[in-house]
Amino acid sequence: MYSAVNPDCRIIHGASPVTLLKAIRNEQEIAGIHAAMQRDGVALVKFLKWLEASVPTGKETEISIDKKLHEFRAEQDLYMGESFDTIAGYKEHGAIVHYEATPETDVQLKPEGFLLLDSGAQYLDGTTDITRTIALGKLTEEEKTDYTLILKGHIALAMAVFPAGTRGAQLDVLARMPIWQRRMNFLHGTGHGVGHFLNVHEGPQSIRCLLYTSPSPRD
């Protein structure tokens, strides 16, 4: 595309004016998002009911549940496909950022521990991106504690009241504070914008730490 630009044209390097326009939802987009989320929620409820009954059989794996979730979503009206490759990580795999199960890494699910499920769909009236941490059975005390700390961060962020102009990096602290107090952290973002039948990650809005390299005071 760049090479097709007429050399007589003046090229301006900067943010596209379309970016900010897309960041503000009109009434039709908001209604579409609500409708898409409702249908996606129906698919997820059906999937979770199926998962609860299927895991104890010992026949399900990370890959097989990914396929089943796709089937439930495909039943919904206006479904066009997945918005990104599903991340279904069982136990240790759930700690790998953007993990994708392969025939070599695929593991059997058991009625114990956590399953991390990060998935979404494209519908004609909206895009979804849903992450859930699902207890498949008995949990360790460490797992219970970690889950509770993350829940506290979610609640703090969801309940936040802030003035216009507040940055996502400032709000990000609210979500991380409970785990920071335990000397823990996560190195990925906390939240991001979602497109309207477009990119599942869509800026410029984002809730994440400002990660950069700076000299240490002791250097």
Predicted features, each with a name:
Residues 1-214, 218-219:
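Active-site neighborhoods and metal-handling regions in enzymes and metal-associated proteins
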